[in-house]
Amino acid sequence: SINLFDEFIVDLEPQFLLQRSLKGNTKSFVKLGDSITGDKVKRETTLKDYFALNSQIKGKINNWKLETDQQISSFDSEKFSEALRFNSNLSKNISFFNSLWNKSFYGIYRERVWNGSIGETEIYLGYGSKLKKQNTWEVNGIRKTEILSFGFANIKAEALNNNNLVTSTKGNLFYLLDQKFPIIVGEPSNIFVDSSYRYIPKPIKRGLSLQTKLELLYSLYDSGNNQQYVSLGAGPEIVYGNFKKKSFDYTKISVLPIYKIKSGDSPFKFDQISDKFTLDFTYDQQLYGPLILKSSAILNLDSDSKDYGDLINSKISLNWKKRSYEFGIFYQPHNEAGGISFTLFGFK
């Protein structure tokens, strides 16, 4: 990290792309001269393609929080427009209707989006603003999370039915209510964290609960298009163990069927509502000591979809979990992508 002035920090992550250097080619770019939305083809690599750079800038401007992320996947000037990805976000908390909201302005250049059975698509260029309120609270043991947001943006992205780029302004309203109802509760023997809690930052709430999810969305586009849906889901979650013993002392399983009632269409691929019926599944299992296996998947149960019965989103990770941090490697079979994750606990 580099301290830039008093209020800004720059994180730089140079990368050497070993696979490209060994193979001598890459399928990360379109044919020279083709549209940026064209099909990726095999292209020969040079020394400039073996290096990449991820960077992040964080800081404050008066009462606003600024974050920018940049990715450069090649230093070849002929590929630079494809190799560069950028997003920025300027936000602050405000008081609105006697509630605390987060107000943000953002800009995007070439952001990848995975949209269920539609697959990977891309926002080529976009800028906009969002007003969002999020609250989490507990009443009689029932944990609730509520999100309400309003957004307005100008977006250039892949069209819904072809690879052409189309531009449209978009306004949207989104509401979510998650609830977790305890059915069988196993209270921890000690509510205080002591030396026996080597792997977790706080005692685990064991038992059986019913989780429910309600989502509402309405989107309007200047092309005259509009789309909306109501999403309902309910399913069990089981948590067993204390994560204190050496092995197999923690298991978490959740199953959540979700059904969407939708109408209308988007002009874009990235936000088109798809997959009316899905099954969300998660499974976490302590293996030995701080080593934990985590997995999640979304199964497409929409009988009208060409991907009926397929996993449209999936992730497997092997993590090293300690009280103050969690580090792991992950792989996503649905898009054959992987990486490294790192989380700190107890920091805001």
Task: Say what each PLM segment does.
Residues S1-K348:
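Long, low-hydrophobicity, solvent-exposed regions enriched in small/turn-prone and acidic residues
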